[in-house]
Amino acid sequence: AIAAKKLGKPIRTFAIGMDVDAIDLKYARQAADYLHADHTEVIISRDDVVAALEPVVAALGTWDITTIRASIGMYLVCRYIHEHTDVRVLLTGEISDELFGYKYTDFAPGAAAFQAESQKRIRELYMYDVLRADRCISVHSLEARVPFGDLDFVRYVMAIDPAKKLNTYGKGKYLLRKAFEGDWLPDAILWREKAAFSDAVGHSMVDDLKEYAESLYTDGEFAARAAQYGYARPFTKESLLYRELFEKYYPGQAEMIADYWMPNRAWPGCDVDDPSARVLANYGASGR
């Protein structure tokens, strides 16, 4: 929104979604229309998702579940941009979650816990969200500009009283939304429930990945093959698939990723066995 106003001419925007149940496409279109952007929608299928999986893992250098899931859509939309446009520099929104809160940080037991979690997530960015953005974009000869990652901005936001970031307003990321009140974005976009990127592409994408992994291993094969890994042992067939692809390209290097990205399981409401916000009790309207 800021770029569109500052440039004074239509910007190029891109959105990606599954062919059967994309969530964010309609909202991206509304925002693009409001900003008078030159907007492109990239539609993908189950076959596209499965075919992209191995090159995504090879590019990322991770076995982490949520990083790989979220990278599929970004990888494919960046590939489209490289192959079909002359755009080579992208604005992307990484790091707003770490600064202003995830869905699961609604369950933070207090301001100090919220702040400590934000600090942890920022320290680990290079293994998760920033890894995803950097690799998915650069592997297609594109460059990223990450405004939320500006060091002055990060320091400013982290100096705000964390009590003001707690979701006591009935809406996550309240401070960030409030900052864009006015004519920056339509209210329907500004105040809608956020969906995680891997979910917003369409719930079917993660479901397809899980089903594909289930088709590759019997229960016995899964147990035997997962047991080979002492570090960050795969705990689902999906995580085993990702680990085996990782080991194909980065054998014996699993320890460069600290752990599976998960909500803070020590918090009430966050003791879950899947990183998706879909499994949280507060998911609500995020999937609509």
Please identify what each model-predicted range represents.
Residues 216-221:
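Surface/interface-facing alpha-helical segments and adjacent flexible terminal/loop regions used
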